[in-house]
Amino acid sequence: MEPRSSERQRGASRPGGYRTEHALAVDASARIPGFRPEPPRSLEELALPFSFVAELVLKIMYFNGNILGRDIAARACLPWSITSDALNFLASEGYCGTTGIRGTAGPGADFAESLQYLVTSLGRERARELLELNQYAGPAPVHLDDYLESARSLVDEAPTVARDQLREALSHLVVPDELVDILGTALTSRQALFLYGPPGNGKSSIAEACAGVLGDPIFIPHALYVHGEVIRLFDPVHHRPVSGPPLTHDQRWVLVYRPVIHAGGELRGNELELAFDRSLGFYEAPLQLKANGGIFHVDDFGRQMIPPRQILNRLIVPLESGIDYLNVARAGTTVSVPYATMLVLSTNLDPGELIDEAFLRRVRYKAHVPDPSADQFRLIFERVCRSQGLAHSSRAVEYLLERHYHPTGRPLRGCHPRDLVGQLVATARYLGVPPELSPDLIDRVCRAYFSDIRPSSTAHVGGNARTLN
C-alpha cells in the first residue's frame, strides 16, 4: 500500500501492533492533568503515515472477522473520519467489502459506521504478509514527537510535595519524622533516593506510597511510533487506569495514576533497553520509560541476576542529564527521550559495598529505614489487629515481647506484626478455636515463624555484600 502524497511523512511506513481494547474513563476524585491530548482531526494531526493506518485497520479486520465500522475505529482508537478514509482505500484495493448494516447510526454519525466490514480473500493474503512483519493490531501508536511534548510537561510542571500531604500518604505506615522529611525533600526535587536498612521494615511500602504525592494522573500512549517501528508503552501490569465517566480526548492515550514500577531480584539487563519481540515484530518499552511521571523502584538492590554496577552504569547518564537514549535497532537509529521518573533503590545490604563514590554522589538522597522502636512495634501490632478484626490486647503484646524477643535479643521488624497475626488467624482456623491473642496461640505461631535457621548474609547476592541487621 503506497502512502498518499499529502500524508505527513515523519518516518518509514512500516506496519506494527498488538491487540487490546481499553475504555478510558475518569475517577470523580481524580484531577485531570494539565496535558490533555486532543483527538486528531486530520491525518496530518495524527502524524502517522496513511499506509501504516490502512495496514493497521486491515489487521484489525483480519483478527475480528465481520466487524462494524465503528468497532474498527474503537479498536484502533481513531476518529471515524480517519478510519473511514482507510476503509475506503482498502475497499478500492479489493482488500475488504461490506456485508450489510447492523443497528442505526447515532445523531450526526456517518451511515457507514453501522456497516459491517469483512476482509476479502485478497485482503487476508495481504494481512498475512503484514503479520509476518509485525502482529501489532491494537490502538494506533502516538508519534514520538507528540509523546516528547507530554513527557517534558512532566518535568516542567512537577509540583512541590507538602509535608502534610506526604504524612497523609504515609498514614497507613509507621514512619519516623526524620525519614518523612528526607522523603519529602527527595520527592520535591525528583532526585534519586536510596532506602537502606534491615529487611522487613517497609522500604517497598514506602516507595509505593510516595507515588501518591507526585501529582495528578497522567496521560500515556498505548504505544509509540518511532521511525516506522512500534513500541508498546502502556502495560496493564504496571499502569493503573483511572476509572469513571469517559473523557473526550485522543483515545490513543490512557489516563493512569502515577506509576510505580517495581523491579526486584528478577530484574535483567534487557529490561532496561528497548526489547524487540521477534515473534510479534514490535518493541516493548524499557521499565524506566514505563515509569515516566512516577517512580522506578529497584527493590532488593544487589540481589539481581546482573551485577549492581551494570544497573548503575545503565542509569547513570539518565540520572545526570535527564535524557535517556534508546536504540531502535531495526530502524538503525537511536532516539532520545526525557527521563522523567524518580529512581528509588532499596536494599538490606550494605550500600557502601554496592555503590561506588561516583554513583553515590548521583543518588542525592540516602535514607536509613530502621527497625521500629518498641512503642512503634506496639502501634503497628494494634493497627494490624484492627485490620484483621482481632481484639487487641496490650498484655498479649507484652507477653510476646518478653517471651520471644527480649530473651534472645531478637530485633523488632515492621513486618512481624502482620506476619504473626496472619499466622495466628490461620492457626486458630486450623485448630477450630477462636482467633485471639492467647499465650498458647502466640507460642505456637512463634515456634513456626521464628527458627534456629541463621540467614546467610550473601545468599543469592551479586557479590559479597553484607546484610544489614
Segments predicted by a language model, with ranges:
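Short acidic, hydrophobic short linear motifs in intrinsically disordered regions
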Residues: 63-75
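Short regulatory helix/loop adjacent to the ATP-binding pocket of P-loop NTPases
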Residues: 350-362
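C-terminal engagement/docking regions of AAA+ P-loop ATPases
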Residues: 438-469
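Conserved ASCE/P-loop NTPase catalytic core
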Residues: 171-344
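Conserved C-terminal "switch" segment of AAA+ ATPases
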Residues: 352-354, 369-417, 430-435
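Short, amphipathic alpha-helical interaction segments positioned at domain boundaries
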Residues: 44, 107-160, 451-461
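A short, conserved structural fragment
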Residues: 91-103
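Dynamic helix-loop-helix/coil hinge segments at AAA+ ATPase domain boundaries and subdomain interfaces
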Residues: 152-180, 390, 407-408
